[in-house]
Curated annotation (Swiss-Prot):
HAMAP family: Ribosomal_uL2_B
Natural source organism: Prochlorococcus marinus (strain MIT 9301)
Transmembrane stretches, start-end: none
Region (Disordered) location: 221-287
Protein name: Large ribosomal subunit protein uL2
Domain of life: Bacteria
Quaternary structure annotation from Swiss-Prot or TrEMBL: Part of the 50S ribosomal subunit. Forms a bridge to the 30S subunit in the 70S ribosome.
Pfam families in the cross-refs: Ribosomal_L2 (PF00181), Ribosomal_L2_C (PF03947)
NCBIfam families per UniProt: rplB_bact (TIGR01171)
Gene that encodes the chain: rplB
Length: 287
């Protein structure tokens, strides 16, 4: 897979960089694994905006993805690699020997016609799912369960992978993409390899309209609003925010405040916290 650049025929194509979609199969999505999804546009059940800058975009249908990999010791053949409008990662369509069809997150390097399997005594190959207790030290994994049988909850985005660092007692230490080292129960399942479509980080939308197609509305800086709309608003011209530090639209400290609960039960499972991102490398915008 590679990225594709365009000649600057228009201002939108000048900055546009996309993936070439060469790994995606031309077949249509599996109808039995597609359901309609009501889009909430950032509103809750009362119609109140709870997530700003959401709405519009192209109509989507949700693909049912198997995050549990609970069909043990049954070979499955990769029949197709499909696009998923709800995530940057691709989906691999599996045909099991017993006739069942399922979607999984497509690992990097998985080809059409390849066989994958899940279980405790399966080959150490990319795409196979197994408990963390039987994985070799130093191996890269993705789609990691936090609780056995609940399904993968971590390391599911495009290009992501965690590393098996150590095994001790009932726990396995994983180094997550955020550099955090966390303990996970050894009976939890994970998939070998990293998630595919890692080149997505090198792409560029190129124009505001393509962002609207994805359901993202414009983000207005707080410093250009009125005082009644944002704590940064008001003043004559380009006025400073008038506070010791930037805040959210609701007056809470922004950019750097730790939001994790201090008495969270899973704190004892975090061996090393993720490294803190500096303001210069964050590149955040005025909220």
């Amino acid at each position: 897979m590679a990225i594709r650049k365009f000649k600057p025929y228009t201002p939108g194509t000048r900055q546009r960089v996309v993936t070439d979609f060469s790994e995606i199969t031309s077949s249509k999505p599996e109808r039995s694994l597609i359901v309609s999804k009501h889009r909430v546009k950032g509103r809750n059940n009362r119609g109140v905006i709870t997530c700003r800058h959401r709405g519009g975009g192209h109509k989507r249908q949700y693909r049912l993805v198997d995050f549990r990999r609970d069909k043990r010791n049954i070979n499955a053949k990769v029949a197709a690699i499909h696009y998923d409008p709800h995530r940057n990662a691709r989906l691999a369509l599996l045909f099991y020997e017993d006739g069942e069809k399922r979607y999984i997150i497509a690992p990097a390097g998985v080809k059409v016609g390849q066989n994958v399997i899940s279980g405790e005594s399966v080959p150490i190959e990319d795409g196979n799912a197994m408990p963390l207790s039987v994985m070799p030290l130093g191996s890269s994994v993705h789609c990691v369960e936090l609780y056995a049988g609940r399904g993968a909850q971590m390391v599911r985005s495009a290009g992501a992978s965690a590393q098996v660092m150590a095994k001790e007692g009932d726990y396995v230490a994983l180094k997550l993409p955020s550099t955090e080292v966390r303990l996970v129960r050894k009976e939890c399942y994970a998939t070998l390899g990293e998630v595919g479509n890692s080149e997505i980080r090198n792409t560029s939308l190129g124009k505001a309209g393509r962002r609207r197609w994805l359901g993202r509305r414009p983000q207005v800086r707080g410093s250009v609003m009125n005082p009644c709309d944002h704590p940064h608003g008001g003043g004559e011209g380009k006025a400073p925010i008038g506070r010791a530090g930037p805040v959210t639209p609701w007056g809470k400290p922004a950019l750097g405040l730790k939001t994790r609960k201090k008495n969270k039960p899973s704190n004892k499972l975090v061996v090393r916290r993720r490294r803190r991102i500096s303001k210069r490398s964050r590149g955040g915008r005025d909220s």
